Amino acid sequence: MLKSFVKNAVTTVVRLPGISYVVQHPSVRQVLEPMKGGQLLYGYGWFRPHPFDRELGIEASGFMPTEQLTIDDSIATRGLGYAGSQPTPVRVALDSLPDLERFAFFDMGCGKGRALIIASEYPFKSLVGVEYAPDLAERGRLNAAICAERYPERTAIRIDLADATTYTFPEGDLVVFLYNPFQAELVEKVVRNIEAAIDSDPSRRVFVVYCNPVSVHCFDASPKLVRRFAKQVPYAASERGFGPNIDETVVIWQGGALPAPTERADDVIQFNEDGTHAFIHYRRYR
């Protein structure tokens, strides 16, 4: 009770106009938020409306465990719930890829579509989300419509209500994106589908972008894919306090008709105690 009282009191004080301006200034926030008690000032995790969402007028924040989604039990027990991607790790990953205007972007387990909207900042030839939960897919379509109205010059977003583990990719070059959507058993099926896409057309080029790669071993084990990128990407100052951590591991693999990577990306990926977050071995998880 005392903890709740203190939290409510602090929240009330920091919302006062003068204090709020100082506390929310990026240079001040960067210092205070990582400190002990910083969560009292800034909240924690996915549950606060994200600045990216507020700016665009979409609703993609929050965390929804699988038991709150309208999906059957066989998927619910192997899914990991919904949470929106942080913009900076997605942008850093996509900035590292060449020739994007020749690629189609697929978000496997796209949820409410935030990663798709971030990807719409880039010149992909198509943007497709694959989502199994009807309620998430519907919200994703509403968010995509808002994005299309505000940015009509961008590539249109399509969201397919489908099972990512049985999804058949169309012809052409692919960027396949995942933000830790489900457990390894289902991730392995996505890997098999990507391998089948490569086998069906050896001339196609494929990149796989995996944020918070808890099932990294599934892709590392594939004979059709090789790592090209592995980094711990800090959140932007404006994003801190709106996700589960202060940075995020991103790993990218490539396959098909692509030249061998020019840089090593064989960093060891480790995990926190409950196995929900991945981090590169040289960084202490926070």
Description of each model-found segment:
Residues 102-111:
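Conserved class I S-adenosyl-L-methionine
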Residues 113-117:
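Glycine-rich SAM-binding Motif I of class I
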Residues 2-101, 137-172:
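S-adenosyl-L-methionine
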Residues 125-128:
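Short beta-strand element of Class I
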Residues 185-258:
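C-terminal substrate-binding/active-site "lid" region of AdoMet-derived donor-dependent transferases
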Residues 133:
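Conserved SAM/SAH-binding beta-strand->alpha-helix loop
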Residues 173-187:
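A short SAM/SAH-binding and catalytic strip from SAM-dependent methyltransferases
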